[in-house]
Amino acid sequence: MTKFKLLLAGSLVAIVSMGLLASNINEREKERVALNKTAHSQGIEGKAMSEEWARYYPRQFDSWKKTKESDNITDMLKEKPALVVAWAGYPFSKDYNAPRGHYYALQDNINTLRTGAPVDGKTGPLPSACWTCKSPDVPRIIEQDGELEYFTGKWAKYGDEIVNTIGCYNCHDDKSAELKSKVPYLDRGLSAAGFKTFAESTHQEKRSLVCAQCHVEYYFKKTEWKDDKGVDKTAMVVTLPWSKGISTEQMEAYYDEINFADWTHGISKTPMLKAQHPDWELYKTGIHGQKGVSCADCHMPYTQEGAVKYSDHKVGNPLDNMDKSCMNCHRESEQKLKDIVKQKFERKEFLQDIAFDNIGKAHLETGKAMELGATDAELKEIRTHIRHAQWRADMAIAGHGSFFHAPEEVLRLLASGNEEAQKARIKLVKVLAKYGAIDYVAPDFETKEKAQKLAKVDMEAFIAEKLKFKQTLEQEWKKQAIAKGRLNPESLKGVDEKSSYYDKTKK
C-alpha cells in the first residue's frame, strides 16, 4: 500500500510538473510570437517616435532606453587641446565631445556650440543637413518634403519637426520591422564605390550597413535645383566621397580633384578637410570587417529572455557585455581581451599626440610666415602637406572606436599624417629663415584655454548666445512639437542635464 501511495504521489508530481512545463512552453511560445509579430500592415502611426514601437517590440525598446545610461560628457578639446589649433576657424574648435548613448544624440546636437544660436528658422551657421544623423524624423521629412527640400535651408528650419532622437525608424521598416536604409545618399555612395546596394546586400551585411547610414565620412555637396513653383534653390546634400574608393587616400584624391574644402584654416589659411565619423570605412579594413563580423554582432549582441531571442538595442561598448559580444567567438579570458584593447588604445594615443603636435605647430609656423610676408606661392606646397597631414590623422581618430576596429590602419594613418606635417615644417624652416625668423618657436597649446586663445575662440560669448537660444527658440520648438503630436514629453526626461558648458546634476 505504501509503495502504491509513493508511486501515485510521484506520478502526480510528474504530471503536475509536465503540466507546468507545458504551460511555460506555451507562454514562451506566445511571447515569441508576440515579439516577432510585425507592425500593422499600414505601418506604425507616429513612426518617428520610438515609444510607438514599444507595443510591438517591448524588449528592444526597453533595451534601447538603456542607452540613457551612457551619459558621461567627455570634453575632447580639454583632453586633446591640439585639436583646437587643428580646427581653428571651424566650429569644432568651440566644442567637441566624445559621443554618448543614442538617447542623447539629438539633444547633444542641439546643445553643441557648433550648431550656433539661431533666433528663427532662417538664421544660424549650419545647414539643415546637420540634423541628418540624429533623428528618425529625418527620413520622415525626406518622405514628406522630398530630399532636396530637406537639404535646403538652415539647421533651425526644422527645429520643431526634428524632435525625436535616434530610434527604431532610423533602421527599420515600420510595416515589417525589416532592416531598411532610410537615406538616399547611402545607396548612391555604395554604387559609386562599386558595392552592392542596401537591398542587394545580405542580412548580415545589412546589420552593418544600417550603421553606415551615419557612421561614414561625408560632405555637403552644393546642389542647385528648382522647386514645384520654379523657384531656384540651393541644397547642401549629404554626399559620400566614394567614387574613387573608400580608403583615406582615395577620398583625399576625390576631394583634391574637385578642389573641395570644408573651411579655410583660421591661422594658416590652408584649405582644410574635416573627417566626420568614418567608422564603416575603417572597419572594412580591420579583421572583424574582413571576416564578416557585423557592427550589430558586437554592439547589439543577441540576448535570450525565456524562449525569446532578440538583439540587444542598448548600442554601446562591447566590453560592457563581453559574455554576449566577445566570448561567443574568443576563447581568451575577458581580462586578457581587455588588456589587448587597452594596448591598442595606448598605441593610438601615443601617435595621435605626436601627429597633432606637429600639425598644430605647422599651422602656427605658417601663420608666422604669412605675418612676415610669405606669399601664397611660397606656401602652396606647405599648405598641401598640412591639408593631407590633418586629413589622414583626423580620419584615424574621428571614429572613436577605429583604434580597435582597424588598429593597423589607424597607426598607419597617424604615421602618414605625422610625416606630412614634418614635411611641411621642414619646408617652413627655409621660408621662416628667408624672412628673418629662423629661431621662431611656435607658442604652446598645452591646455584648451591656451589653444582657444590662439584660435581666437571667444567661449564666453558663444556660451552666452547658446544659453539664450536654449531659453527661447529651443523651448518654442519643443512646445510646438508636443502640441502637434510629434513628440512624447516623456522622452525629454533626463535628456538635457549635461553639456560641455553646464551640468544641472551638480549643485
Curated annotation (Swiss-Prot):
Nucleotide-binding as UniProt keyword: no
Record-listed substrate binding positions: 218, 277
Molecular functions per Gene Ontology: calcium ion binding; heme binding; nitrite reductase (cytochrome, ammonia-forming) activity
Residues that, per the record, bind heme c 2: 168, 171-172, 313
GO biological process, one term: anaerobic respiration
Binding site for heme c 3: 102, 211, 214-215
Keywords: Calcium, Electron transport, Heme, Iron, Metal-binding, Oxidoreductase, Periplasm, Signal, Transport
Residues holding Ca(2+): 217-218, 274, 276
HAMAP family: Cytochrom_C552
Cofactor: Ca(2+); heme c
SUPFAM superfamilies: Multiheme cytochromes
Main subcellular localisation: periplasm
Keyword Cell cycle in annotation: no
Metabolic or biological pathway: Nitrogen metabolism; nitrate reduction (assimilation)
Family according to the record: Belongs to the cytochrome c-552 family.
Binding site for heme c 4: 295, 298-299, 405
Alphabetical list of PANTHER family matching this protein: CYTOCHROME C-552 (PTHR30633:SF0), CYTOCHROME C-552 RESPIRATORY NITRITE REDUCTASE (PTHR30633)
Protein name: Cytochrome c-552
Organism: Wolinella succinogenes (strain ATCC 29543 / DSM 1740 / CCUG 13145 / JCM 31913 / LMG 7466 / NCTC 11488 / FDC 602W)
